[in-house]
């Protein structure tokens, strides 16, 4: 099933890209464990990484610091490698409230979660691709370091079907039930199967567009075919097929029975400890909760919160690292850590926060001590498991630079010839009035301005002041969720307003070519928000505009300011010299606003191919491409209902057209999911 990686791009590497590709490739071939790609904003770091992957032909995991950047990278990689397996692996929770106990108020908060089915399907598709083929790129968030089902158990549970194999129908149905597939002869949907005479239809959990038909003759598999579950159109006849479990956490019955015995032993030991310490309430609470879980596991094979017993279910010892997505990555895989100065500290912080919450649950008798082993990886475990790694950042952290040593690859020259912004330092005393005049000058020529302040109060006051003076301004603060944040950025690019004020939110991954000015207020206040890295990242937001400029308001030049200004000047000088030597005239970017959200259009079109000549792919309406994410979600629900209605009325062509449109809208929604 594996193919060769084939890079699809109208562009050839230029600027610093060819040298960066050569050095990274040579380093990996020489066995270097750590390399850093120091690439400025807009220098085509993703394109460089894509070229390295295509040259080396190795399965790759790309780690991003958040879902928004992961979605952006997924869209770019999907365009670069349309014929290969580009997968998306982020947290599948739309909403997640972990169980917790607050001793001060004696409040227990039950776990509450809402799972996004589309993202769950993409996660299953990602692990399947890693197990089946080598031309795989998995774009993941830091969710990848959290516990996942053991790959060995996952592989053992698979159901292999081949033409001509001898197996009776009941055996297949029993195996499907073990894989947690549910029989549903009425509503055929993902993760279900239906039976009609000697024909079994299975809708694989990792698929969103094709189902499997198993035709039996007596006790022999006579024919296997893939078909469109909506129209019934047969896509292809195949020789073999592997049915993967419906969930990563599926466990064989014998392992569950063994786990239950181990849990009983631990419960007896823990009860003894609690009674010795005169913790009668905690002992009663723990006994009651654990006994209930054991009964559920015995009857159903699972229970609510079964992940808290994951140590026993995966057969690990106390304190051992949990199985994660890294266990599915082949030994010669490649790891790319995007925006590494943010992602690496995140990986280190996940374990500590999780541990503190669970220790309270254990102490007060809500969970057994083994629940502490249901956790994300520790940083040391991540280091031990990580394959050869490329750290990608415009401002690499100390960790990456220390690990890479001399192996830091500079990518400063942009293919477009754009230079880093001009930097000016101006006094604090007149910063607000000076900023107002700069905003007005840019609003006239239809350019945008980003302003970053030190405190929430100052951001609110500045926004109010600018509004009073007739400026079109919005304020981006920490209470705004990802979806609304995407809407605000889109509105800024569309020209609904001219100025965006924020604190620490105007940094990594915001591609806004319309922004020509970045103003940093109180730049001389040394600290986290005004460190060298923060300043360089913020200045970089104006690097995609031909008139890019950054104004730092400060009465003195701090060490961080001096380093940031010096580094930016070094880059400008190198970029300018390259342009002179090669006769390049800088060109501004003309990136369509919908490009931020329209990540999966190409994917939707390729998936629509080859499913019957009666099908005509439906292009997404241009209006839909600029819908807000909330409106997109509502539109998706409406179309799902319409599609099922068409199918029930046997109007298969109309249902298929609606389904094509759904594919596109779901991909648009991923960006803000």
Swiss-Prot record:
BP GO terms, sorted: nucleotide-excision repair; SOS response
Chain positions of motif Beta-hairpin: 92-115
Gene3D superfamilies: P-loop containing nucleotide triphosphate hydrolases, UVR domain
Pfam families: Helicase_C (PF00271), ResIII (PF04851), UVR (PF02151), UvrB (PF12344), UvrB_inter (PF17757)
Record bears the keyword RNA-binding: no
Binding site for ATP: 39-46
Gene Ontology CC: cytoplasm; excinuclease repair complex
Entry's free-text remark on domains: The beta-hairpin motif is involved in DNA binding.
Assembly and binders: Forms a heterotetramer with UvrA during the search for lesions. Interacts with UvrC in an incision complex.
Family the entry assigns: Belongs to the UvrB family.
Protein name as it appears in the record: UvrABC system protein B
């Amino acid at each position: 099933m594996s193919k060769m990686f084939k890079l699809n791009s109208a562009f050839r590497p230029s600027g610093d890209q060819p040298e960066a590709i050569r050095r990274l490739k040579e380093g990996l071939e020489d066995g270097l464990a750590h390399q850093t790609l120091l690439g400025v904003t807009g220098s085509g770091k993703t394109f460089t990484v894509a070229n390295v992957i295509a040259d080396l032909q190795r399965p790759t995991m790309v780690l991003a610091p958040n879902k928004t950047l992961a979605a952006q990278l997924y869209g770019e990689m999907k365009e670069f490698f349309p014929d290969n397996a580009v997968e998306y692996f982020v947290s599948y929770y739309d909403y997640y409230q972990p169980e917790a106990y607050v001793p001060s108020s004696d409040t227990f908060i039950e776990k509450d979660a809402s799972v996004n089915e589309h993202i769950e399907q993409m996660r299953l598709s990602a692990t399947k691709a890693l197990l089946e083929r080598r031309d795989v790129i998995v774009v993941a968030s830091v969710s990848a370091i959290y516990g996942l089902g053991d790959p060995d158990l996952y592989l053992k549970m698979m159901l292999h079907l081949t033409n001509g194999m001898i197996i009776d129908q009941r055996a297949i149905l029993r195996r499907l039930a073990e894989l947690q597939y549910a029989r549903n002869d009425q509503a055929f949907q993902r993760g279900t199967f239906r039976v009609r005479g000697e024909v079994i239809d299975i809708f694989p959990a990792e698929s969103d567009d094709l189902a499997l038909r198993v035709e039996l003759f007596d006790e022999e598999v006579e024919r296997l075919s893939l078909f469109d579950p909506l129209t019934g159109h047969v896509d292809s006849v195949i020789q073999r097929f592997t049915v993967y479990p419906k969930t990563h956490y599926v466990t064989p019955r014998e392992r569950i029975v063994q786990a239950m015995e181990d849990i009983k032993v631990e419960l007896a030991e823990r009860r003894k400890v609690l009674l010795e310490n005169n913790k009668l309430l905690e002992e009663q609470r723990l006994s009651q909760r654990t006994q209930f879980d054991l009964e559920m596991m015995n009857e159903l094979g699972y229970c609510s919160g079964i992940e808290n017993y994951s140590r026993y279910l995966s057969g690990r010892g106390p304190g051992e690292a949990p199985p994660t997505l890294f266990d599915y990555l082949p030994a010669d895989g490649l790891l790319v850590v995007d925006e590494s100065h943010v992602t690496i500290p995140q990986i280190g912080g996940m374990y500590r926060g999780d541990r503190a919450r669970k220790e309270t649950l254990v102490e007060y008798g809500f969970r057994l001590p083994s629940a502490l082993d249901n956790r994300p990886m520790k940083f040391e475990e991540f280091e031990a498991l990580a394959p050869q790694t490329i750290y990608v950042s415009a401002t690499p952290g100390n960790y990456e630079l220390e690990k890479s040593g001399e192996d830091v690859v500079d990518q400063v020259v942009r293919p477009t010839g754009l230079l880093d912004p001009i930097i000016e330092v101006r006094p604090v005393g007149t910063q607000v009035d000076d900023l107002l005049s700069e905003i007005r000058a840019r609003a006239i020529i239809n350019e945008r301005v980003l302003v970053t302040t030190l405190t929430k109060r100052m951001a609110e006051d500045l926004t109010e002041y600018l509004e009073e003076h007739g400026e079109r301004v919005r304020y981006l603060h920490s209470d705004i969720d990802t979806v609304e944040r995407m809407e605000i950025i889109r509105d800024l690019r569309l020209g609904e307003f001219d100025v965006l004020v924020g604190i620490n939110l105007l940094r990594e991954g915001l591609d806004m070519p319309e922004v020509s000015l970045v103003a940093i207020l109180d730049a001389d206040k040394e600290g986290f928000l005004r460190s060298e890295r923060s300043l360089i990242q913020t200045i970089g937001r104006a690097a995609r505009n031909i008139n890019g400029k950054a104004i730092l308001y400060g009465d003195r030049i701090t060490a961080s300011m001096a380093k940031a200004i010096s580094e930016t000047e070094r880059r400008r000088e190198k970029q300018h010299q390259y342009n002179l030597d090669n006769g390049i005239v800088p060109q501004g970017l003309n990136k369509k606003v919908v490009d931020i959200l329209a990540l999966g259009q190409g994917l939707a079109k390729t998936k629509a191919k080859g499913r019957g000549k009666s099908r005509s792919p439906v292009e997404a309406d241009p209006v839909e491409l600029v819908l807000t994410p909330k409106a997109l979600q509502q539109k998706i629900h409406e179309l799902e209902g319409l599609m099922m209605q068409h199918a029930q009325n046997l109007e298969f062509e109309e249902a298929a057209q609606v389904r094509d449109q759904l594919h596109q809208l779901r991909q648009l929604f991923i960006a803000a999911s």
